[in-house]
């Protein structure tokens, strides 16, 4: 068993518009408060479920006050809170109340048993990288964002191919005609990048993956770059080209706009139950080894 730091103040976060989330959040709050932890709620979550008796805090206030944030929802909820809390280094615990759950790895049915043990110090910790990106127009930055999974430059559904000029560390890589280009973290390699035939990167691997979306030339293949690379994607052709930062869209791109992407100085600490296995997650979520032996289960 791995013993880490015991926490004191615990922030609870849920996807506020999800039906049926109020009861498990209230149940978890009562469970951990009974064990002596101070419980606070993220403000939108508190408003949605009516968490009377617990302080309601903004993400910035959570970052300043809470020792850990417990997120009940899907991967999207976890990604959004991770971006907001990244500057504060607040650790995240993810409880799966969504569908896929690559990064919310605790089943909701187990949370009342597992979460208190983790808050008491029994957990495994890892750091996840983020990307920071900005849009540059006529030499001036006009937009800035963080991305946990990916930065995606793509065409709209009704326009032709986008034409992109891609440079890495100031050196020309290629011009590409395609439906778009994905720049993904190791965490994001199992998201949109995977559906576009990109490789899976272990989350502790220091790399950034570029994955073309339906390229005109089949020789345009995914490539994994060092994670200190500085990537520049210039719009040189096409119309109605968009850029998304973890599905947060900026839709007003113009010809010659450049999207600059690099690893963020921030990382997000993820906490897992003792015995967590990334490979077991892949096996379960991607349906590898559908009929494992009991020996395989013991090694998970």
Curated annotation (Swiss-Prot):
InterPro entries: ATP-NAD_kinase_N, ATP-NAD_kinase_PpnK-typ_C, NAD/diacylglycerol_kinase_sf, NADK. One of its GO terms (molecular function) is NAD+ kinase activity. The keyword Ribosomal protein does not apply. NAD(+) binds at residues 75-76, 149-150, 177, 179, 190-195, 214, 248. The keyword Cell cycle does not apply. Disulfide bonds: none annotated. Its main location: cytoplasm. Pfam families: NAD_kinase (PF01513), NAD_kinase_C (PF20143). One of its GO terms (biological process) is NADP biosynthetic process. Its EC number is 2.7.1.23. Signal peptide: none annotated. Its cofactor is a divalent metal cation. It is found in: Cytoplasm. Involved in the regulation of the intracellular balance of NAD and NADP, and is a key enzyme in the biosynthesis of NADP. Catalyzes specifically the phosphorylation on 2'-hydroxyl of the adenosine moiety of NAD to yield NADP. PANTHER family: NAD KINASE. Belongs to the NAD kinase family. This is NAD kinase. The lineage of its organism: Bacteria, Pseudomonadati, Pseudomonadota, Betaproteobacteria, Burkholderiales.
């Amino acid at each position: 068993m791995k013993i880490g730091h015991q926490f004191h103040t615990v922030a609870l976060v849920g996807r506020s518009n999800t039906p049926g989330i109020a009861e498990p959040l209230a149940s978890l709050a009562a469970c951990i408060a009974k064990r002596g932890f101070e419980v606070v709620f993220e403000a939108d979550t508190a408003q949605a479920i009516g968490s009377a008796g617990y302080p309601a805090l903004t993400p910035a206030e959570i970052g300043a006050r809470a020792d850990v944030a417990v997120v009940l929802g899907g991967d999207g909820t976890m990604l959004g809170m991770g971006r907001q809390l990244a500057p504060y280094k607040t650790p995240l615990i993810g409880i799966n109340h969504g569908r896929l759950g690559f990064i919310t790895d605790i089943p909701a049915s187990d949370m009342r048993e597992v979460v208190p043990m983790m808050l008491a110090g029994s957990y495994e910790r890892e750091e996840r990288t983020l990307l920071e990106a900005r849009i540059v127009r006529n030499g001036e930055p006009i937009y800035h964002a963080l991305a946990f999974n990916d930065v995606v430059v793509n065409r709209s559904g009704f326009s032709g191919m986008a034409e992109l000029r891609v440079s890495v560390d100031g050196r020309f890589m290629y011009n590409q005609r395609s439906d778009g280009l994905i720049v993904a973290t190791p965490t994001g390699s199992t998201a949109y990048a995977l559906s576009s035939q990109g490789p899976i990167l272990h989350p502790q691997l220091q790399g950034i993956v570029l994955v073309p979306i339906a390229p005109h030339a089949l020789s345009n293949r995914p490539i994994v770059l060092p994670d200190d690379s500085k990537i520049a994607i210039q719009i040189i052709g096409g119309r109605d080209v968009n850029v998304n930062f973890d599905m947060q869209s900026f839709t007003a791109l113009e010809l010659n706009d450049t999207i600059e992407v690099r690893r963020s100085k921030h990382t997000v600490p993820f906490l897992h139950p003792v015995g967590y296995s990334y490979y077991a997650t892949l096996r379960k979520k991607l349906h590898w080894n559908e009929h494992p032996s009991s020996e395989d289960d013991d090694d998970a």
